[in-house]
Amino acid sequence: MIQTKLKGMGVALITPFKEDESVDYDALIRMVDYLLQHNADSLCVLGTPAETPTLTEEEKKTIKKMVIDRVNGRIPILLGVGGNNTRAIVETLKNDDFTGVDAILSVVPYYNKPSQEGIYQHYKAIAEATELPIVLYNVPGRTGVNMTAETTLRIARDFNNVIAIKEASGNITQMDDIIKNKPENFNVISGDDGITFPLITLGAVGVISVIGNAFPREFSRMTRLALQGDFANALTIHHKFTELFNLLFVDGNPAGVKSMLNAMGMIENKLRLPLVPTRITTFEAIRKVLNELNIKC
């Protein structure tokens, strides 16, 4: 079952750019290979760290195909299919080719600031438009509206193909409420690297990670240890990354993780406007921590 396959550390894949801001497809393939070789349990394509709003439709299609072909069924692939135009999402789900996609990740509608009933009706329309498994994504810091535990549980109970939520509200009480009251066939996945460990101790099944782009082996190990109940060793790894968690987002996402990957010699430190690279002070702080962790820069 796809619920089982989505346990562990998924990675929300970045989009590498060249200096001229064109997509660096060679670097993209290197990233996919790196993640496959270092224990990523799933990949999320065209999510937030991919800078999806800045990509053309042709670029999105090419990225999707290249990643699916490279992964070749070795791990599950989630595809970001979200927005604030419900009708457009429904049309996409009905008309696009989802061969090789194991589930879709669909964010709570942003900017429009719908009511809880509007959020429910949005996901109802999506769930009824596809047989693909759906992972909800609650990230009020970006969308401007929080999907409450009550709404999440209502959706989870009413639609069998809604299999999980990526929770990034930062509200542990809300997340715990979902975990305690969820249907058996519905899982909670952390959407925030920094709270992955504590959330797993409450019953979450893993994370869709940003920092996993740079450190898949260690972050996957932490996640697996926590899921196995080896909290002491998992906590040691969690503490190892505490400072990097903070640096990851101080200048925005994916600027932080792109600086990390650049310091490690893996990609150009390039983003598309309106996003810009981290400040020099942040970049140097990242290099300092990486050196302290004995990671090649």
Regions found by a protein language model. Name each.
Residues I2-G144, R154:
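Active-site beta->alpha loop and helix N-cap motifs at the rims of alpha/beta catalytic domains
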Residues K5-P16, Y34, H38-A40, P49, ...:
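C-terminal alpha-helical cap/extension of soluble enzyme domains
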Residues L55-E58, E91, Q116-I119, M147-A149, ...:
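Short secondary-structure transition/capping segments
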Residues L28, K60, K64, I89, ...:
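A general structural signal for well-ordered alpha-helical segments in protein cores
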Residues N138-V139, N161-V162, R272-L273:
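Glycine-rich phosphate-binding "P-loop"
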Residues L13-T15, D26, T52-L55, N85-R87, ...:
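Basic, gly/Ser/Thr/Pro-rich low-complexity segments located predominantly at protein N termini
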